[in-house]
């Protein structure tokens, strides 16, 4: 969890994280700007909540660069370690398919409870009524479902799906599907969301999304697909204000993963490095561009800052961005 805090002016100590990497045999030391156990800044009132949801596999540190950044902009950010879906606990894919939407909703509810608990350090700090979710890959899969796009019946019966039609609770054909959605999710940021290329949705399902959503993807992403994947999702979500940012020539690692840990680069085999790196783009550059647009998106839709729309309405092929598209009507 990252949050706005009161930091003494003479405080120069930077935060450190000890994190398991994509090669579970290697543990990395990550350096950030957050200070552990800092005094929460409650004088400014409560802050909108942002939930960060990683891919399969991943962990809560993969997008720590974004968690820290958004907290510095006046948000409480929480990054999930998804059970059965982390580097050192990668279990059957079916568990992730079933649990990812549920995990995200559980964390929103738990953070809301902690925000109301005055004995907890988050007491009075969290405004869960204004929640944003960042989902990368399988995190994006869960996010898109939680925004209102129910899965197809083909997904429920897929060979990779959990048994006994468990996915039916997340399906568009379930008459109670929309009742399970959390109305506190007021903005989504979907990074290379998985599932369209794998027919887990029918295109008409995205009409069920009415929440402002920012889509980010590389146009060479062969994991989730571009023209037949994320662009289809973006175009079909016509009932929502939405944006699409494309990293030209980038693959599935566009934007979200932190730079490859030095411990992996220094290892004899370098195993796991390709989990973080893109063949074309520099990680820090991708992270910074993503943070720029995430800041604008969440400030606009969670805080009501209309000046942020100038940063979202970029022209196509501007040198400062990749490809930007304005919101749909």
Q: Residue ranges of each PLM-predicted region?
A:
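Gly/Ala-rich beta-loop-alpha elbow adjacent to hydrolase catalytic centers
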Residues: 135-139, 143
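Mobile cap/lid helix-loop segments that gate and shape the active-site cleft of serine hydrolases
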Residues: 20-33, 148-205, 211-225
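Active-site-adjacent alpha-helix of alpha/beta-hydrolase-fold enzymes
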Residues: 207-286
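Catalytic active-site module of serine/aspartate enzymes centered on a nucleophile-bearing elbow/loop
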Residues: 261-329
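Alpha/beta-hydrolase active-site loop
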Residues: 62-72, 92-129, 142-148, 154-174
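Domain-level recognition of soluble alpha/beta enzyme cores
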Residues: 2-50, 227, 263, 276
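Active-site machinery of serine-nucleophile hydrolases
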Residues: 4-7, 61-88, 94, 101-102, ...
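Short amphipathic alpha-helix adjacent to the substrate-entry channel of hydrolases
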Residues: 32-52, 57-81
């Amino acid at each position: 969890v990252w949050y706005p805090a009161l930091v003494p002016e003479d405080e120069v100590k930077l935060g450190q994280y000890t994190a398991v990497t994509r090669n579970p045999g290697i543990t990395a030391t990550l350096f950030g700007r957050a200070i552990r156990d800092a005094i929460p800044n409650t004088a400014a009132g409560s802050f909108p909540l942002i939930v960060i949801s990683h891919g399969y596999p991943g962990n809560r540190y993969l997008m720590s660069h974004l968690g820290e950044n958004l907290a510095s902009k006046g948000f409480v950010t929480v990054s999930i370690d998804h059970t059965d879906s982390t580097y050192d606990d990668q279990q059957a894919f079916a568990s992730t398919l079933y649990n990812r939407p549920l995990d995200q909703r559980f964390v929103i509810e738990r953070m809301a409870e902690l925000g109301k608990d005055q004995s907890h350090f988050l007491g009075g700090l969290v405004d869960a009524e204004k929640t944003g979710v960042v989902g990368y890959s399988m995190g994006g899969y869960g996010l898109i479902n939680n925004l209102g796009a129910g899965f197809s019946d083909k997904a429920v019966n897929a060979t990779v799906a959990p048994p006994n039609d468990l996915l039916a609770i997340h399906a568009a054909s379930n008459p109670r599907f929309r009742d399970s959605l959390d109305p506190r999710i007021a903005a989504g940021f979907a990074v290379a969301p998985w599932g369209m290329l794998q027919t887990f949705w029918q295109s008409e399902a995205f009409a069920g999304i009415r929440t402002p959503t920012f889509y980010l993807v590389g146009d060479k992403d062969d994991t989730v697909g571009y023209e037949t994947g994320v662009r289809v999702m973006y175009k079909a979500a016509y009932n929502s204000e939405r944006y699409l940012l494309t990293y030209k020539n980038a693959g599935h690692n566009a934007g979200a993963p932190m730079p490859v840990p030095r411990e992996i680069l220094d290892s004899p085999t370098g195993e796991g490095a390709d989990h973080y790196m893109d063949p074309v783009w520099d990680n820090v550059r991708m992270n910074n561009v993503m943070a720029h647009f995430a800041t604008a998106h969440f400030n606009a839709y969670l805080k009501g800052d209309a000046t942020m729309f100038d940063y979202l309405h970029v022209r196509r092929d501007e040198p400062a961005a990749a490809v930007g598209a304005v919101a749909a009507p």
